[in-house]
Amino acid sequence: MAKYQFQTEVNQLLKLIIHSMYSNKDIFLREIVSNASDALDKLKYLTVSDDKYKDVAFNPRIDISFNEEKKILSVQDSGIGMDEEDLTNNLGTIARSGTKAFIDMLSKNGSGSSDLIGQFGVGFYSAFMAASKIDVYTRKAAGNGKVLHWSSDGTNSYEIEELTEKSEAYCQYGFDKSETVGSVIEIHLNDDSKDYASRWKIDELIKKYSNHIAFPIYLHYVQTKYNKDGKAEGTENKVDQVNSASALWKRNKSELKKEDYNDFYKTISHDGTDPLMYVHTHAEGTQEYTTLFYVPRTAPFDMYQADYKSGVKLYVKRVFITDDDRELLPSYLRFIRGVIDSEDLPLNVSREILQQNRILETIKTQSVKKLLSEFKKLGDEAKKLEAKTEISDDEKETLEKWHDFVKSYNRPLKEGLYSDFANRDEIAEIIRFKSTADEGSGENKWTSFADYVQRMKPDQKSIYYISGSDEKNLRSSPLLEAYKKKGFEVLIMADDIDDIVIPAYGKYKDFELKSVSRAGSDEELGVDKEEAKKKEEAFKPVQEKIKKALEGRVKDVVLSKRLSDSPSCIVVDENDPSLQMERMMKAMGQGGGDFVKPILGE
């Protein structure tokens, strides 16, 4: 038996799981069953797309058995199986960047982080919450026929050996038949988890977490037989299918309840909370496809990581194709979880073909439009409810849903203004901003471009905004003084990407977007030109003195029209990057100390 050391990050993860995560131990079975389903999906795809697997008999099933006396719980699948390299890569290492940050997050969140294990793609390790030891028996489909045995108690190392015919597990799990492929996860339950070796506990958890797994799950158990007098007279082995095994997204919407949608979301997302909303679409006509999309209640932890994992699975006629294609939806919708199932794509479609496929491009285009339409609908509904003095409990839930949506997903949606030219006007109707008009109205008061335009002064020609990194500081900026006095509303933009996406968007309908921190944005303040000229002449000597004193530090010193109380302010030239942009670029190692010279207004 060869012994291997776990990767350092795996060791850290296992220590956290074993010693800190105990609040929701139930999810380990969900993760193991989900992995079994993935293994079946992979083999199903290969049997129809790869000649190497054409002779493999695909009999999809997941079998769960237990031994109450020995405290053993086993989950067996007839999926793709693993060879030695797979065992090392899948069960001995974590091949993702961001692992250290992920482990740090788990450390901080402690026992409340069990759901994140599956979301990061390492759900197998969650079984150590309930296990004193785990044995894995596996034979890879279309491989060399060997049965391998992986074993670990979760402390530092694992062992791999070839399983011989003399081994009890070899025959117990059917590996004596050459056509048996797939994997068995045998969990030796610790003393605190022995309740999981129970028919009723397993049945309850499968129905709760895995009912909508698309393959049949069978529970094996021993039932006591009783005579007519109620006395036990022996036992019999029983096997029951314990899940519905249907592709929920293919079912008619009228058949499904909210609970069905929520349960399926938890199955595919590894998230223990209900989703914020879902969008289920059946399209027929020149192309036939089904989509079921979810918006998570909490933003995915890797939403701002460069190697974020796609949350959308692609199927063709219910055959799983991939869950690792980030082109299925644009990156600004990377928080979406769900399923796309096409009736028209070829089953043997490759990743390269996917990127250029017109059918998939059409599905993507229509899906984006549908999602943006639903987001706008929710926002419009919330706006109506905010105007009401009394609302029902259901209306309150809708309002909270919208507030949560804005807090979590306003920022990534803004990216679409920059990257998605075809849908930027639709996105502009959804995104929200803080405003000088909502002073003291609470954290849930937001303004849309449409709201701003509705409140504009009759003679106002531009939409004004101020950008920076801190909302509180922006609200007290002297740059706002004259605009407030004039009664011009100013949008407060405190997201780090605002200075990139807003200038790129440039104009909402017929109204130009102008930053109050830029020279030339104060033309509408209505200063008397003759009066301004007199002041300019009077202050010229002072300006020259200040300019000389600040030589090399500022680009210019000018008389400002935008101040009413403060003696001076700093703005940037209309052709220069903003100060917020300068900070961002310096943080990325671009630009030196003299990157942008500001203009002093007095």
Task: Please report, for each region that a protein language model flagged, where it lies by residue.
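GHKL (Bergerat-fold) ATPase N-terminal catalytic module, capturing the glycine-rich phosphate-binding loop
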Residues: 1-191, 195-196, 457
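GHKL/Bergerat-fold ATPase module in large chromosome/replication-associated machines
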Residues: 116, 134-177, 190-195, 200-602
